[in-house]
Amino acid sequence: MKKSIFSKKLLFSFGSLVALAAIPLITISCGQTNTDQSQQPGSGSGSGSGTSNGSGSTPTPEQGNNQGGSTPTPEQGNNQGGSTPTPEQGNNQGGSTPTPEQGNNQGGSTPTPEQGNNQGGSTPTPEQGNNQGGSTPTPEQGNNQGGSTPTPEQGNNQGGSTPTPEQGNSQVSK
């Protein structure tokens, strides 16, 4: 009889000790959770204007996305390279700085104004078409896609030969 009363008291006191020890642990864990939540300033906040700034630079108003390390000037397009393009240009994806009113500059050369796209390593003259090869065609020609330099007033030269003036398309090497 005495053993059962003693065992009941022992179980009760052990249970109360466990409960008392669990209360501070629960309080500490809740306090840490609240502390972690309170130590997050600025979460969910953002500055106005709606433009994305993907680097450490601060773009000026009315710009597009700035993904490089440079600060573009206003009213430009996307600046994805390390250079600073001038206003009113298109996309500058290379390491060169194109002049105003040009198209896209995707190569390492600097085309002159009022040209088309320059995708090669050469600098075409004004009022030409697209220059996709390594040669420099003369003005008022068509597209030059080969390695030869056609004479003026010709059509497209897609082969390795140089046709004479007033011919049509030369597609085979003669």
Curated annotation (Swiss-Prot):
Lipidation (N-palmitoyl cysteine): C30
Lipidation feature positions (S-diacylglycerol cysteine): C30
Domain of life: Bacteria
Protein name in UniProt: Variant surface antigen F
Main function: Responsible for the antigenic diversity for host adaptation. Expression in E.coli of a construct containing vlpD, vlpE, and vlpF yields antigenically distinguishable products corresponding to each gene.
GO cellular component: plasma membrane
Region annotation (9 X 13 AA tandem repeats) ranges: 55-171
Subcellular location: Cell membrane
Membrane topology: Lipid-anchor
NCBIfam families assigned to the protein according to its UniProt record, in alphabetical order: Mplas_variab_LP
Disulphides: none
Protein keywords: Cell membrane, Lipoprotein, Membrane, Palmitate, Repeat, Signal
Bias-annotated ranges (Polar residues): 62-174
Region ranges (Disordered): 32-174
Sequence repeat start and end residues: 55-67, 68-80, 81-93, 94-106, 107-119, 120-132, 133-145, 146-158, 159-171
Signal peptide annotation: 1-29
Compositionally biased spans, kind Gly residues: 43-53
Note, other: The numbers of repeats can vary and is one of the basis of the antigenic diversity.
